[in-house]
A protein has these predicted regions:
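Phosphopantetheine-dependent thiolation modules in NRPS/PKS and related acyl-activating systems
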Residues: 1-39, 43-85
């Protein structure tokens, strides 16, 4: 894993999901919902807030927080990378 944003996002996801919900092979393609981290809407809010704090960015624009952007660890990391650019 060479993407530092992805590494930090994966750490946040692991913290929010808890050890019992972290997939064994978690990576960029791991879904945030079903068949992945199994995050619900409250968990997703916690992830978004943690990412805002960790990366010192705002993720408040509903046009950015699309279903596609929140589909996987990698898509969330890509959104964050765009915000940091």
């Amino acid at each position: 894993m060479t993407d530092p944003a992805l590494a930090r996002v994966l750490a946040i996801l692991s913290g929010v999901a808890g050890a019992d919900r972290v997939p064994r092979e978690a990576g960029a393609d791991t879904p945030l919902g079903e068949n992945g981290y199994w995050l619900d809407s409250v968990d997703m809010l916690e992830v978004i807030l943690a990412c805002e704090h960790e990366f010192d960015i705002s993720l408040a624009d509903p046009d950015e927080l699309t279903e596609e952007a929140l589909a996987s660890a990698g898509s969330l990391a890509a959104l964050i990378a765009r915000k940091l650019a």
